[in-house]
Amino acid sequence: MKTKINHILPVLLLTAASGLTTVSCNDFLDKTPDNRTELNTDQKIAKLLVSAYPDVSPNELFELYSDNSDDSGPTYGYYQLSEKECYNWEDTKEEYQDTPNSLWGGYYGAISAANMALKAIEEKGNPASLNPQRGEALVCRAYCHFMLATIFCNAYDTHASESLGIPYMEDVETTVSPRYERGTLEEVYRKVERDLLEGVELISDDGYSVPKYHFTRKAAYAFAARFYLYYMKPDFSNCDRVIDFATRVLGSNPDDLLRDWEALSNLSVNGNVQADAYIASSNEANLLISSTVSNWGALGSDYLVGPRYFHNQTLATSETCLSAGLWGSSDYLYLKPFSTTGFVASIPRKSGLYDGGYLYYMPVLFSTDETLLCRAEAYALKKMYPQSAADITSWQRAYTRNKSALTPDQINAYYDKMNFYTPFTQQTPKKQLAPDFTIEEGMQENILHCILHIRRVTTLHEGMRWPDIKRYGIMIYRRNMVTQRVTDEMPPNDLRRAIQIPRNVIVAGMQPNPRRN
């Protein structure tokens, strides 16, 4: 296992200065190191920007924390102790990959590399020839801080000016033991917005030989769409920015830009066949792909490891990737998860098992499918119901065999009739919503239920459900599937929704997240 030892925050990334990158014998990983075609740019800055992309993923942590996981009982094992801790919403003691400690170090390490690049560009006088690199560094810095806030802070809401943030690193650190204040979540989001908006206008797509491993314009627009969706305002003015940036990615007719789910479903779920196709850089639906050191690829493989605290067949058939919906029964869904006789887990094959000394995982960070659902949600919040229904129709035609057009009335009627979820007795995708912002009963709420349902189906295994749970104040439960008992519950105001910062950071003097309601 790969263990990282971090101080209160990483200091200079000395290895990044020499362009150190992850290397693997796997074909996909061999393509990850930057092969930028230099166009009058500085080689060292270009190499340094490779390290501005984090080599960590929160997907395992987020999936374990969310309602996409159950305790299937002691008959089944778990891969590492942290899976048990994270599933039970405990403050994690372990420090290997996929833990909060690893994520903290990975994201701040990438931020340090971005800041070093920005400093080097500044020392050259910020020449126009380096604008693309400056833009890429700014967007990387914004993204990493955004992810840290998504992990270690509450969801952004009207109390953000009173909620703990995370340190926003804007300079190259030159002291051995600096002290940092966390500030507020409001301050973090404002700085993310500043860096993102400045950076996105500077990015150029012309300098990359493998663009899908970089923030191209479209990838940056997709990030902006998701960021503004999370940057929720009581009047939903943020949704105008979501629609704007998502439309820059998708245009007015997104159908041809979405993933070919039918073709993907025809590939074998064994080995890496389907998984490799899902993460292929040649796929137009993939806007940004990452290479990370993570066990999540192993847990999501056909090696059948660690199934105890995991997505199981009960969840699949009642709430997620084999559930019924507007499209009809699960027979209408193209993509089917991997499972086998006597095996409780139900696994969507979205990343293969790649071993290059460590276990590697290749997440798709941004895709056209997810960006489409960001726009559909923004339309629904703005009460632009026909436009939202049109985007939902585009999703349905791509993801299912049902090619019919959906109307707002049809969506409203379907989810209005659906019973609300209760553990064990009424297992449906429809859960009580208690967000900080106001949702109207009826049409608006039911279209949002639809979007939350199909996003959960589409992005299963990719960590997107946990932010939705936080944003919408969804009550979730820990269920023992053997005893048929609820062992814990997490209401909307539960302080554990802000995952605890690493212990060594707390010991070094940083304010921890509170733990008593």
Residue ranges and their predicted role:
Residues 240-369, 402-438, 458-459, 463-464, ...:
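Hydrophobic-face positions in mid-chain alpha helices that act as interaction patches
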Residues 151-191, 234-244:
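Short coil/linker segments at helix-helix boundaries
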Residues 25-26, 218-259, 509-512, 516:
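Aromatic-residue-lined binding/catalytic grooves and analogous aromatic/hydrophobic interfacial grooves
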Residues 149-156, 207, 230-236, 381-383:
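Short coil/turn linking the two alpha-helices of tandem helical-hairpin repeats
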Residues 83-153, 179, 183-187, 196-208, ...:
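Conserved, well-structured interaction surfaces
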Residues 1-24:
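Sec-dependent bacterial lipoprotein signal peptides
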Residues 25-72, 473-517:
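Membrane-proximal, proline-rich intrinsically disordered regions
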